Amino acid sequence: MGEVRRIAKPFFPWVGGKLFLLPYIFQLLPRRAPRLLEVCGGSGAVTLGLGAGYAPLRVYNDIDADLANLFRCARDRPLALLRELDFLPLHARADFEVVLRFLNHGYDPNDFLEEELQIAEEYFPPMDRQEVKKLLVGRANLPDVQRAAAYYLSIRYSYSATGNSFGGRSVELRRFLGLLRRASDALQGVVVENKDCCDVVRQYARTGAVIYADPPYLEAERMYAPSFALQDHVRLHDCLCAPAARDSHIVLSYNSHPDILDLFAPDFYIVGFDRPNPMARQEDARYHELLMTNFDPGPMLNRQLSLLDNPGLVSSDRPELRILSAPTGRLPRVWDWPQD
């Protein structure tokens, strides 16, 4: 077995993050692909985890413009992002509310630029004055980085990473620095889009491409913005069944909702497992996690997960995937998976 590769992980908490699902998702993917499309990007766990060597073309997409901007800044300006976070210390609810006002276009930190430059002129000695003014002007010329830092703080310090209520969580700076550095490295060469997921599928899907979709779970992620209603799930289903995507390797993650099962079961294999549900009040409550594929996953379920060789993801006591249903509406494609 080769050298253990330390994978990149999401560098911020995220509602519905899929880090715990990665062993199951990777088990269903080919070893390599010409294209990787993560069309409902969220925390980007799949794109980050597979890394630069997985596909010549990798696309991360999310409909949330602030989230897409955060990924662009992490890819292109990680040091500027870190510096901007130093400008935005967040210690109390009032600080958090200022960040939300900025994100909601009710406050612009550059409104006080002239005043800050004047203060620097009056109170700093000449040598320090020029450095301070240069720093202030340089920061004002990076509105995308300012917004990315504010968005990160709104997630990191909010209750349950919802981005809308102060939770007062502490930050381990050393751990964050490591996460951001590895994420920035993994994002090099990634195309970051801010589009509707179906538009990305139509634009980038090709024969052999891997498409991973993790849409907001129906009636389970009400905190997600923008909303994703049942008709949006129908659009996604129809898009993935259209000719443009039919010859791609498609994997979706979903919750076990009757409307979702009725929608996808005729055209997709459904595999899943149960896990403890810490959010439920009932003791020993279980949560049903589903993965859906447009190919027969049977040959993959017994495949040893050596893609990552990472003991942090592969656990001997994790539940095994089970095939729950096979499509009835058409003859599904059975992929000839490469072993190397």
For every predicted segment, state its role.
Residues 32-36, 55-57, 187-191, 244-250:
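Short active-site oxyanion
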Residues 25, 36-50, 60-64, 152-159, ...:
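Conserved proline-anchored active-site loop of SAM-dependent methyltransferases
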Residues 50-53, 202-206, 260-266:
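Short loop/helix-cap segments at secondary-structure boundaries that form the rim of catalytic
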Residues 53-191, 307, 314-322:
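Class I S-adenosyl-L-methionine-dependent methyltransferase module
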Residues 1-38, 45-46:
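S-adenosyl-L-methionine
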Residues 165-169, 216-235:
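Mobile active-site "lid"/loop adjacent to the S-adenosyl-L-methionine
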Residues 225, 230-340:
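Long, positively charged, glycine-interspersed low-complexity recognition regions
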Residues 191-193, 271:
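General small-molecule cofactor/ligand-binding pocket signal
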